[in-house]
Amino acid sequence: MALASVLERPLPVNQRGFFGLGGRADLLDLGPGSLSDGLSLAAPGWGVPEEPGIEMLHGTTTLAFKFRHGVIVAADSRATAGAYIASQTVKKVIEINPYLLGTMAGGAADCSFWERLLARQCRIYELRNKERISVAAASKLLANMVYQYKGMGLSMGTMICGWDKRGPGLYYVDSEGNRISGATFSVGSGSVYAYGVMDRGYSYDLEVEQAYDLARRAIYQATYRDAYSGGAVNLYHVREDGWIRVSSDNVADLHEKYSGSTP
């Protein structure tokens, strides 16, 4: 009863001396008119956050294409931070499970985190449903997860490649939640050069060695023209019985092979 009686008493905000305002409670207004020169003490609204003062450039070249023997996945291995080459041995093909691969383009931390989270979700799906997740479902799962963070600064452009009941599957997913199915994709700063090679040499009926050579040549051409791509060409092949790592070729060796020049 004592507490109730205290709470029922009105606060003396209009009494002289309260808050040191001499009884003028109207001075508590913190709107634009409360201060001179149109200033305000009100907190800013929750608008679109400002762009960061330092913009870090991302550069890479990744590609994937479907053909009658599966899916070919290839990527360079150079990591850059602006004009600085941070590493020449980055693994840009992420192994989700024995039948699924993902590629890394954009922010390395974003791609690595979300695709490893996807690997966990795919494993949970497999345990619950007693079967492997399809390529389409895995790509949709990733798109739904990153869409919740749209506009919050994520930087990711990935390809989900695999083999399921329907055969080889290939999807492009980015940090905006976009998801596209296709036969050929290339992502990264060197993708324009890789597309030029793939568009000329791609066919669904390629033989295995022809497909390997096309992927190596496309990544090599991108590293030759794009300063943000380089290192080695890591090549994977997704087959009906799972993916295999085919090779890792230094671009200097490929330069001798494809350009015909000598050191």
UniProtKB/Swiss-Prot annotation:
Bortezomib binds at residue 108. One of its GO terms (molecular function) is threonine-type endopeptidase activity. GO terms for biological process: proteasome assembly; proteasome-mediated ubiquitin-dependent protein catabolic process; proteolysis; response to oxidative stress. It holds the Pfam family Proteasome. Changing residue 108 to T: Displays resistance to the bortezomib, a proteasome inhibitor of the chymotrypsin-like activity. Displays high resistance to the bortezomib, a proteasome inhibitor of the chymotrypsin-like activity. Residues 1-59 form a propeptide. CDD domains: proteasome_beta_type_5 (cd03761). The active site is at residue 60. The keyword Nucleus applies. It is an enzyme of class 3 (hydrolase). Its EC number is 3.4.25.1. Keywords: Cytoplasm, Host-virus interaction, Hydrolase, Nucleus, Protease, Proteasome, Threonine protease, Zymogen. It catalyses: Cleavage of peptide bonds with very broad specificity. PROSITE patterns: PROTEASOME_BETA_1, PROTEASOME_BETA_2. It is found in: Cytoplasm; Nucleus. GO terms for cellular component: centrosome; cytoplasm; cytosol; extracellular exosome; nucleoplasm; nucleus; proteasome complex; proteasome core complex. The keyword Ribosomal protein does not apply. Changing residue 108 to V: Displays high resistance to the bortezomib, a proteasome inhibitor of the chymotrypsin-like activity. Induction: Down-regulated by IFNG/IFN-gamma (at protein level). Induced in breast cancer tissue. Up-regulated by sulforaphane in breast cancer cells. InterPro entries: Ntn_hydrolases_N, Pept_T1A_subB, Proteasome_bsu_CS, Proteasome_sua/b, Proteasome_suB-type. Component of the 20S core proteasome complex involved in the proteolytic degradation of most intracellular proteins. This complex plays numerous essential roles within the cell by associating with different regulatory particles. Associated with two 19S regulatory particles, forms the 26S proteasome and thus participates in the ATP-dependent degradation of ubiquitinated proteins. Belongs to the peptidase T1B family. The 26S proteasome consists of a 20S proteasome core and two 19S regulatory subunits. The 20S proteasome core is a barrel-shaped complex made of 28 subunits that are arranged in four stacked rings. The two outer rings are each formed by seven alpha subunits, and the two inner rings are formed by seven beta subunits. The proteolytic activity is exerted by three beta-subunits PSMB5, PSMB6 and PSMB7. Directly interacts with POMP. Interacts with ABCB1 and TAP1. This is Proteasome subunit beta type-5. It comes from Homo sapiens (Human).
